[in-house]
Regions:
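N-terminal flexible/basic segments that precede or flank functional cores
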Residues: 1-31, 35-36, 41, 90-102
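DNA major-groove recognition helix of helix-turn-helix/homeodomain DNA-binding modules
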Residues: 67-82
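The alpha-helix within a helix-turn-helix
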Residues: 33, 44, 73
């Protein structure tokens, strides 16, 4: 019996968690931006970040630095914690749906 097959690949789990968290944060940025009627181009100008970088953040493909989170939040006229709380709500809502539909 191969005991290695019974172990969880923790690096793979962590990568998956990071991807899901990045997607939730990106969705929070996007929904806030859209709610305010701001384009990615305007957000890029106001945050002094590249539009392609912001697109990557919103799609969950990029993990923003702490400095970038503060720039994005400032440009959206919200606190960084507001973006994280919205992302957290999304994550918990998704987990609750998964628990209800096994």
């Amino acid at each position: 019996m191969d005991f290695r097959s019974s172990f969880v690949d923790h690096s793979r789990v962590k990568r998956n968690e990071a991807r899901i968290a990045a997607q939730a944060f990106g969705a929070a940025v996007r929904s806030t931006r859209v709610r305010l009627g701001i384009t990615q181009e305007t957000l890029a100008e106001q945050s002094q970040l590249a539009r392609t970088y912001l697109s990557g953040v919103e799609s969950g493909l990029r993990n923003p630095t702490v400095a970038s989170v503060f720039r994005i939040a400032s440009a959206l006229h919200v606190r960084p914690s507001d973006l994280f709380l919205e992302a957290e709500r999304t994550l918990y809502a998704d987990n609750a749906e998964d628990d209800e539909n096994p």
